[in-house]
C-alpha cells in the first residue's frame, strides 16, 4: 500500500503523511508544522489533514473496543474478588466443624471453644465482606 502511495503522491506528501502516522493524535492535531506553510505547502497541509482525520476516525472506531475491554476487565476483577466470598463460606464451615469436633473430644471446654468459634466466624466473615466490598468497588466505582 505504501508503494502505491509512493507512485501516486509527491514525496513531500508522503513525508507529511508518514509523520502524522507515527505521532500521537494530540501531537498531530496541536502542533502541525505543515499548517504554517503557504502556497506549495497547501497540498502538504491537505495531506496531513486527511491523515489526521483518518487517525481520528480510527481512534473513534477503537474506543468502543477499548470500552468493551475495560468492561470485561471489570467483570473479571469483580468475579475474582467474589471468589473470596466463597472462601469465607468455606472458612466459616471449617470453624464450626472444628467446634463440633473439639466439643465431641472434650465437652468440658464448651464455653472456651464456643468463644474461639465466634472469633473465627467473625474474622472469616469480615474477610468475606471485605472481598464483597472490593467486588462492588470494582464494578461501580471504577
Curated annotation (Swiss-Prot):
**GO BP terms, alphabetized:** proton motive force-driven ATP synthesis
Annotated effect of mutating residue 79 to V:
In DYTSPG; likely pathogenic
Residue positions, PTM N6,N6,N6-trimethyllysine: 110
Where is the protein localized?
Answer: Mitochondrion membrane
Q: Which UniProt keywords apply?
A: CF(0), Disease variant, Dystonia, Hereditary spastic paraplegia, Hydrogen ion transport, Ion transport, Lipid-binding, Membrane, Methylation, Mitochondrion, Neurodegeneration, Transit peptide, Transmembrane, Transmembrane helix, Transport
Query: What does the record note on quaternary structure?
Result: F-type ATPases have 2 components, CF(1) - the catalytic core - and CF(0) - the membrane proton channel. CF(1) has five subunits: alpha(3), beta(3), gamma(1), delta(1), epsilon(1). CF(0) has three main subunits: a, b and c. Interacts with TMEM70 and TMEM242.
Q: Which family does it belong to?
A: Belongs to the ATPase C chain family.
Disorder noted: Dystonia, early-onset, and/or spastic paraplegia: An autosomal dominant, highly penetrant movement disorder characterized by spastic paraplegia and/or dystonia to varying degrees in affected individuals. Cognition is not affected. There is high intra- and interfamilial variability in phenotype and age of onset. Some patients have onset of progressive focal or generalized dystonia in the first decade, whereas others develop progressive spastic paraplegia as adults. Some affected individuals have manifestations of both disorders.
UniProt protein name: ATP synthase F(0) complex subunit C3, mitochondrial
**Gene name tied to this protein:** ATP5MC3
